[in-house]
Swiss-Prot record:
Matches recorded under InterPro entries: Ebola_NP (IPR008609)
Biased composition (Polar residues): 495-505, 537-552
Name this polypeptide is given: Nucleoprotein
Function of the protein: Encapsidates the genome, protecting it from nucleases. The encapsidated genomic RNA is termed the nucleocapsid and serves as template for transcription and replication. During replication, encapsidation by NP is coupled to RNA synthesis and all replicative products are resistant to nucleases.
MF GO annotations: RNA binding
Domain notes: This protein can be divided into a hydrophobic N-terminal half, and a hydrophilic and highly acidic C-terminal half. The coiled coil region is critical for homooligomerization, for the interaction with VP35 and for NP function in RNA synthesis.
UniProt keyword terms in alphabetical order: Capsid protein, Coiled coil, Helical capsid protein, Host cytoplasm, Host-virus interaction, Phosphoprotein, Ribonucleoprotein, RNA-binding, Viral budding, Viral budding via the host ESCRT complexes, Viral nucleoprotein, Viral release from host cell, Virion
Length: 695
């Protein structure tokens, strides 16, 4: 015995076995009415159970053989199904006019009988059977991909057929619920798939509009789920006049071994004959030996070569470790193409001028094909990224925040940092609502959540170059985007002119809504800033100091809730001692160079409203977050007259634009914004809060 044959043991059946299955066929003198009632039962979502396969086969026999049982029994369809283990049991009831009358009177059919008694059927047209079968065939091309892709493909085909005037389907058939039912039936019914495929391939005469739709759908189903077979046979095992030659890129020894194994798997697949291109849809034997993962290098090279030839079907992702191999194969194939074209042009061109024209044309043709391929692939990836973002958002909203919500209170009560400056506000009886946490632990978890929302898009893929990052990020609210989205300033809340009870109810509703949607990333409540200020980010990147977060992007925490403005008292300012220079090595800033420019466009210069300009300073009670009656965010005036929005301005990892303007224009040795950016310190939340009161 050859010892190496051990590797192949168990891959081929030595005692083939076929499981026997019984299929019930219905035979009456009113076959069209029975078939229409079967269609109505399926459309109504009634589960026919083990009668489903028989009911579908009854429809096929009526449509293709006009219910002639003798013709059907001698047909290739019946022979194949018998070889596959199906046994036909015919129930005859000549006088039956209802589907109810032909159902066996057995206990396990009683729920089905009760459901059918409530079903009213008024249709008795024979053409409706072909209409239903053609509608089912629309789901075949993308059946192995999934329900969403299959339904989208079916709807596109319906639109095409309606525009061409071929056939029009009832509107209630085109609802998502009904189409999911049909998809589930087609996914589970081998008989229906097999009969549609067999007749779509072999029906050569007697076509009506429904049969042409079925043939068209079956043609699109060829090699569905067998992309590796199609690409390898077309581009790797190249057929020439002298025989089959290997592509130059797969002539190395290791890839040759994969090619040999792949040829063996193909020979096993070819035993299925005319049904081999539909092996994945029909789930035929040997299909599991044709997975991409079994031939990683061959698959990567084949996909790279196919993409170089303009195949958009090859836009699938290979394993991450073989992504670079795919890119290398793509580049090499493009160069080989140019070389072959150059050689051909040299052979067929009669003079230099013709050679130049042909070379220019082929160069343009290659570039156009390549750009079109990249455009289609980028569209596919954008669609995939949007789908991934939607799924990620749903998961995070349903699960992620529930886990971190329990830690909100505790994380805030643990901050013992002393604050020297005080704020006095009139106490109002209102429900206590703690500000949102600035907790590095929670922020790090949410960072990981957001980074996985784009996991479907391979960052190393050269074909994602045309992806519009801004578009992808806009569709996913979980991914921070400061370049493509301009924040609009929040309108100033209405002054308190109603009873305390009314304002209390509004504040409860507002804070509740904010807690419900914590991950909407400033969509509903952006920070207060002007349009011309949108280039600096509001991300809080405290996770930079944490291990393992070097490659992750900082995630915004939800902003503090905005309450209705209160009646304010005159501020009482206390001198504060500066303990830290927030501007690093910029120099001495003792002079009051931070005088705000009083213009409507400056974020630090609010409109001429005395209430809006009244300064607030934090009280010692705020250390333990007991004074929760403050407005969030607050305008804070420092001892140098600088107005900041606390905590928003000081939580930024980049200096605010108003501060940049003041330093660049008024400092005696002007510094550039780039230098200021470099000197802007990396501080924790506690340090920023401390600096905010001591500028």
């Amino acid at each position: 015995m050859d010892l190496h044959s051990l590797l192949e043991l168990g891959t081929k059946p030595t005692a083939p076995h076929v499981r026997n299955k019984k299929v019930i066929l219905f035979d009456t003198n009113h076959q069209v009415s029975i078939c229409n009632q079967i269609i109505d039962a399926i459309n109504s979502g009634i589960d026919l159970g083990d009668l489903l396969e028989g009911g579908l086969l009854t429809l096929c026999v009526e449509h293709y053989y006009n219910s002639d049982k003798d013709k059907f029994n001698t047909s290739p369809i019946a022979k194949y199904l018998r070889d596959a283990g199906y046994e036909f049991d015919v129930i005859k009831n000549a006088d039956a006019t209802r589907f109810l009358d032909v159902i066996p009177n057995e206990p396990h059919y009683s729920p089905l009988i009760l459901a059918l008694k409530t079903l009213e059927s008024t249709e008795s047209q024979r053409g409706r059977i072909g209409l239903f079968l053609s509608f089912c065939s629309l789901f075949l091309p993308k059946l192995v991909v999934g329900d969403r892709a299959s339904i989208e493909k079916a709807l596109r085909q319906v639109t095409v057929h309606q525009e061409q005037g071929i056939v029009t389907y009832p509107n209630h058939w085109l609802t998502t619920g009904h189409m999911k039912v049909i998809f589930g039936i087609l996914r589970s019914s081998f008989i229906l798939k097999f009969v549609l495929i067999h007749q779509g391939v072999n029906l050569v005469t007697g076509h009506d509009a429904y049969d042409s739709i079925i043939s068209n759908s079956v043609g699109q189903t060829r090699f569905s789920g067998l992309l590796i077979v199609k690409t390898v046979l077309e581009f790797i095992l190249q057929k020439t006049d002298s025989g089959v030659t290997l592509h130059p890129l797969v002539r190395t020894s290791k890839v040759k071994n994969e090619v040999a194994s792949f040829k063996q798997a193909l020979s096993n697949l070819a035993r299925h004959g005319e049904y081999a291109p539909f092996a994945r849809v029909l789930n035929l034997s040997g299909i599991n030996n044709l997975e991409h993962g079994l031939y990683p290098q061959l698959s990567a090279i084949a996909l790279g070569v196919a993409t170089a030839h303009g195949s958009t079907l090859a836009g699938v992702n290979v394993g991450e470790q073989y992504q670079q191999l795919r890119e290398a194969a793509h580049d090499a194939e493009v160069k080989l193409q140019r070389r072959h074209e150059h050689q051909e042009i040299q052979a067929i061109a009669e003079d230099d001028e013709e050679r130049k024209i042909l070379e220019q044309f082929h160069l343009q043709k290659t570039e156009i094909t390549h750009s079109q391929t990249l455009a289609v692939l980028s569209q596919k990836r954008e669609k995939l990224a949007r789908l991934a973002a939607e799924i990620e958002n749903n998961i995070v909203e349903d699960q992620g925040f529930k886990q971190s919500q329990n830690r909100v209170s505790q994380s805030f009560l643990n901050d013992p940092t002393p604050v020297e400056v005080t704020v006095q506000a009139r106490p109002i009886n209102r429900p206590t609502a703690l500000p949102p946490p600035v907790d590095s632990k929670i922020e790090h978890e949410s960072t990981e959540d957001s980074s996985s929302s784009s996991s479907f898009v391979d960052l190393n893929d050269p074909f994602a170059l045309l992806n519009e990052d801004e578009d992808t990020l806009d569709d996913s609210v979980m991914i921070p985007s400061t370049t493509s989205r301009e924040f609009q300033g929040i309108p100033e809340p209405p002054r308190q002119s109603q009873d305390i009870d009314n304002s209390q109810g509004k504040q409860e509703d507002e804070s509740t809504n904010l807690i419900k949607k914590p991950f909407l990333r400033y969509q509903e409540l952006p920070p207060v800033q002007e349009d011309d200020e949108s280039e600096y980010t509001t991300d809080s990147q405290e996770s930079i100091d944490q291990p393992g977060s070097d490659n992750e992007q900082g995630v915004d925490l939800p902003p503090p809730p905005l309450y209705a403005q209160e009646k304010r008292q005159d501020p009482i300012q206390h001198p504060a001692v500066s303990s830290q220079d927030p501007f690093g090595s910029i120099g001495d800033v003792n002079g009051d160079i931070l005088e705000p420019i009083r213009s409507p466009s400056s974020p630090s210069a609010p409109q001429e409203d005395t209430r809006a300009r009244e300064a607030y300073e934090l009280s010692p009670d705020f250390t333990n977050y007991e004074d929760n009656q403050q407005n969030w965010p607050q305008r804070v005036v420092t001892k140098k007259g600088r107005t900041f929005l606390y905590p928003n301005d000081l939580l930024q990892t980049n200096p605010p634009e108003s501060l940049i303007t003041a330093l660049v224009e008024e400092y005696q040795n002007p510094v550039s914004a780039k230098e200021l950016q470099a000197d802007w310190p990396d501080m924790s939340f506690d340090e920023r809060r401390h600096v905010a009161m001591n500028l």
